[in-house]
Amino acid sequence: MDQLVPAERYSPYRFFSAEDWAKFRADTPLTLTEDEVRRLRSLNDPVNLEEVRRIYLSMSRLLSAHVEASQLLFQQRQVFFDSDHAVKTPFIIGIAGSVAVGKSTTARVLKELLTRWPSSPKVDLITTDGFLLPNAVLSHEGLMERKGFPESYDVGAILRFLSGIKAGLPNMRAPIYSHLTYDVVPGEFAVIDRPDILIFEGINVLQTRDLPRDGKAVPFVSDFFDFSIYIDAPEELIHEWYVDRFMRLRETAFRDPNSFFHRYSTLPEVEARTIAEELWTNINLKNLRENILPTRPRADLILRKGTNHLVQEVALRKL
């Protein structure tokens, strides 16, 4: 049973412990192996097959119900308009949350689970990293220290991409981002061709912006979502995960001479950790408090993590 304490009766969410949430899996089959989960998870994210059983299978079942309801509504609208020429549009899932909280792992695991539904839907995954302005532009505008903040994204390009996806247009292109060079890759794109489901993941996907004074309509990125997920965790844990990940990257990816952060791989450990702490405090913590955490109440589903990246509580928006 969900925990309906008095203060939560007035919440738009129903709250479940991870153990109670796991029961909603029902007969949803586990279609991933331990090796596949290991391949899908991000650096420093220890999610395993047991966590897939506890949390992700119930999520998969819930999303299946939402997709089926969307398909039924589409059919009913065809009857309403007495038309069989309508273009079926993809079901879009948005995934938001802080840097280092585990968004990418969640997105990749969900993609694999959804792809393996009995209906075998075509599922694509795009991150907002590719929609960051190129480093040359950020440097010219003095925004390199604000990378990841709302103003560092080409929001117009995001909206055009999602508009095309929702319009059912073929071969929509999304820019590709390199975490090695820490920049958008010039001239390279992921081509998304009318998927059944699109997962759109990034720290900024639930953010709103100020309405224009001239009264013109301005869509938000989340206006295109059929379902949204926020990955949550206590601030001190995200801090710990960010610094730990930085230090592990220092021993791995940063050692590549082509890495934007290669210079950090040669620093003494104490100095490198100091830099990681400064990056967290001056950039990522500030962005979390100002722009990311305030969007949490806009999500349909909130996964609250505890130690070891394990989900401890799930909040599902009431219908």
Curated annotation (Swiss-Prot):
It catalyses: (R)-pantothenate + ATP = (R)-4'-phosphopantothenate + ADP + H(+). Keywords: ATP-binding, Coenzyme A biosynthesis, Cytoplasm, Kinase, Nucleotide-binding, Transferase. Signal peptide: none annotated. It comes from the Bacteria. CDD domains: PanK. Pfam families: PRK. One of its GO terms (molecular function) is pantothenate kinase activity. Pathway: Cofactor biosynthesis; coenzyme A biosynthesis; CoA from (R)-pantothenate: step 1/5. Its EC number is 2.7.1.33. It is an enzyme of class 2 (transferase). Its main location: cytoplasm. GO terms for biological process: coenzyme A biosynthetic process. One of its GO terms (cellular component) is cytoplasm. Belongs to the prokaryotic pantothenate kinase family. This is Pantothenate kinase.
